Amino acid sequence: MEFSSDIGRLQRRAASSMAGMSRRQAILEALPVSKGDHVLDIRCGGGHLLAHLAKDVGDDGHVFGLDPSADQLAEAKTHCAEHGNVTLLHSFADAIDLPDASCHAITSTQTLEYIEDVDASLAEATRVLMPGGWLVNVSILWDHFCFYGADADLNARIHDAFRAHCHHQMLPMELPGKLTALGYRHIRDTSLAFVNARLNANTPAFYLEQLIAGFALGQSVAEADVTTWREQLAAAEAEGRFGFTSFPVLTAACRG
C-alpha cells in the first residue's frame, strides 16, 4: 500500500489514538535502551515514537528515523523539532544508510508486513544492529482485523478487498523462524490485541474505517456499497452493537 498524503494523515491520527499510545508504551517497555545508545526506528511515520526514544537516549545518544515517504518525514521533523539528537533518513528498509553494527536497538511498527521482500529488509536491519542488540517489531495478524456491525456479506467483501493492502497477512507467525535463521535468540511474542466498541476520534477504528473505505474503492468495490457499509457501521455504533478488533503482536529478539 502506497502511503499517500491522505493515507499518511489517517495513519498519524490513528497513531495518536489511545491504542497508538498504548502500543508505543509497549514498545518502549520492551526495548532495552540506555542513555548514549543509538536507536533506529524503521518507517518512523510522523515521529510519535522518535520523540520518546530521543528522550530515552539523551543528549549523548542518537535516534534515526527512516521512512520512504517525504510527507511522513516532514511531519516527523516538525514533531521532533525540539530534539537535537534525531536524524531522519529518506529511504526504504532494504537500503539503510548507516554503518554495520551501528545501532544498539531497532524498532519497526506495522512496517515489515508491507515489504514484499521482507527477508532482505530483515537482513539489512541485522547488518545495522550490533551483536547483542535488540530488535522490536509490531505487526498485525490481519486475519483477525475486523469491523463488526455491517451486513455480513457486504462486510466480508470490504474486508476481502482490503487484504490486498499488504504482502504478509500473518507475519508474526513467520517472524520467529526468520529471526532464528538470522541468528537471533531470546525471541518472544506479546499480544497487543484490542477491541473498540465505539467509533470516535480517540479510537483507531475511526480512522481505519476511512482508510479501508478508500482502499476498497481503489479495488473496484462500488461506491454505493462502500457508502452503505459505512452507514451500517454508523447505525451499529448508534445502536450499541458496533465493534472493531485488531491483533497486533510485538516480537522482541536479541541479535546473537
Write out the residue ranges for each language-model feature:
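Conserved class I S-adenosyl-L-methionine
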Residues: 1-37, 48-56, 71-75, 79
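C-terminal helical/coil "lid" or tail adjacent to the Rossmann-like core of SAM-dependent
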Residues: 2-9, 13, 187-243
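Class I SAM-dependent methyltransferase SAM/SAH-binding core
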Residues: 38-42, 46-95
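Short glycine-dipeptide loop
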Residues: 59-60, 129-134
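A short acidic, Gly/Pro-enriched loop at the edge of an enzyme's catalytic core
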Residues: 94-105
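A short SAM/SAH-binding and catalytic strip from SAM-dependent methyltransferases
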Residues: 104-117
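A short glycine-rich, Lys/Arg-flanked "PGG" loop and its adjoining helix->strand segment in the class I
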Residues: 119-131
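Conserved catalytic/acceptor-binding region of the Class I
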Residues: 136-201
